Design a protein with these regions (language model features):
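Noncatalytic scaffold domains of N-terminal-nucleophile
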Residues: 4-96, 100-102, 106-152, 212-213, ...
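Extended C-terminal subregions enriched in glycine
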Residues: 300, 333, 342-374
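Internal maturation/activation junctions in enzymes
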Residues: 166-262, 274-275, 282
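Short, well-structured alpha-helical segments that form the helix of a local strand-helix-strand
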Residues: 26-37, 107-111, 175-188, 347-357
Length: 374
């Protein structure tokens, strides 16, 4: 089954520009158009992902035409050109939202997806509408942490922090066995709620206030056995991903915390002919279990892992931050904040510090962690 939900980034760019932009919309695209048409050196990271993806995607329609030459993808330092993408970006730059969600680009996307067995239609694209949403927030030791609500997973970071606020982490010490155990158990409890509740709020009633309440966090914290790993159902959400994050501030005090992702490395493998890009793979995160809050439905947004964030102190900006890495993101959000607030790290140290990442089943393996892994 080819499950492709509507791509939303372009509509999001348009809305951001309408609300905050002070340059012409078309001028924002010109540097990227130039890189796509004239070429740019391939970085080590991009070369790695291209090489890793080619065995999976080289038999997919149109992949080789865009990303391969003489049977190989571009290597580190090679100059890569994508004139098809340059053409598509020029259409968007000139026509704005209509250049992508209506007309020939939208028709090409819809026709291609349907030839591949998918259900995305021209009308789905034409009617797509990104939304302004209110962030969710919880106080952690005097700092307000702001995250995206469902259909994202920002609530997970808040739940982890609320649970861990019931313990003296500084006394334990960063990366002590006690701290690692408590963090992992808090993560497992938060992810159990993620698996059950997180979905498109337009289709499901999600108990956000309860999930991020301090009283609920105390109840969850009481479930943690300091001497034994708990058996908690795994979330069943795939952990792979490929994401970019950036944050920026201007002289007027505005900050942006921005994250985008095609998911699963390069995305879905679906490359509409002549457009120079691969469609994202976020539809994979729908559930196929009838009655589940995140079950696939028409017009519905799937559960998302990507979550930009802010922290404020006494109503004033403290940091704008985010990380990449699918299910790693809320775990890393919580740890960066803990490093800053509990352990007194500066921002560079908090970001550079090693991170705990728990994934897969919550069933203990009964194998000891290797000391050198810490």
């Amino acid at each position: 089954m080819c499950i492709r939900d509507s791509p939303g980034a372009v509509d999001g760019w348009v809305k951001l520009h309408e609300k905050f932009g002070n340059q012409s919309f078309s001028s924002l695209f010109q540097p990227t158009i130039d890189y796509a048409r004239k070429g740019h050196p391939v970085s080590e990271t991009i070369a790695y992902y291209l090489d890793r993806s080619k065995e999976v995607f080289k038999e997919y329609p149109n992949f080789s035409e865009v990303w391969m030459k003489d049977g190989e993808t571009a290597g580190k330092g090679d100059v890569f050109k994508n004139p098809q993408l340059a053409d598509t970006l020029e259409i968007i730059a000139e026509k704005g939202r209509a250049g992508f969600y209506e007309g020939e680009v939208a028709k090409t996307i819809a026709d291609f997806i349907q030839t591949q067995g998918g259900f995305l239609t021209y009308d789905d694209l034409a009617s797509f509408n990104s939304e302004w949403v209110d962030p969710v927030s919880s106080n952690y030791r005097g700092y307000a942490v702001w995250e995206l609500p469902p259909n994202g997973q920002g609530v997970v970071a808040l739940q982890i922090l609320n649970i861990l606020e019931n313990f003296d982490l500084k006394e334990m010490g960063l990366f002590s066995s006690e701290y690692i155990h408590l963090f992992t158990e808090a993560k497992k409890l938060a992810f159990a709620d993620r698996a059950k509740h997180y979905a498109d709020p337009a289709f499901s009633e999600i108990p956000i206030k309860q999930l991020i309440s301090k009283s609920y966090a105390k109840e969850r914290a009481a479930l943690i056995d300091k001497n034994k790993a708990a058996l908690v159902d795994k979330s069943g959400i795939p952990s792979g991903g490929d994401t970019i994050y950036l944050t920026a501030a201007d002289k007027f005090g505005n900050m942006v915390s921005l994250i985008q992702s095609n998911y699963r490395g390069m995305g879905s493998g679906m490359v509409p002919p002549g457009l120079g890009f691969m469609l994202q793979d976020r539809g994979e995160l729908f559930s196929l279990v009838e009655g589940h809050a995140n079950v696939i439905e028409g017009g519905k947004r799937p559960f998302h892992t990507i979550i930009p964030a802010f922290v404020t102190k006494d109503g004033k900006p403290f940091i704008s931050f985010g990380v990449m890495g699918g299910a790693t993101q809320p775990q890393a959000h919580a740890q960066i904040i803990i490093n800053l607030i509990d352990f007194g790290y500066n921002l560079q140290e908090a970001g550079d510090a090693p991170r705990i990442v728990h994934s897969g089943s919550s069933q203990p393996t009964n194998e000891k962690m290797q000391t050198e892994a810490v």
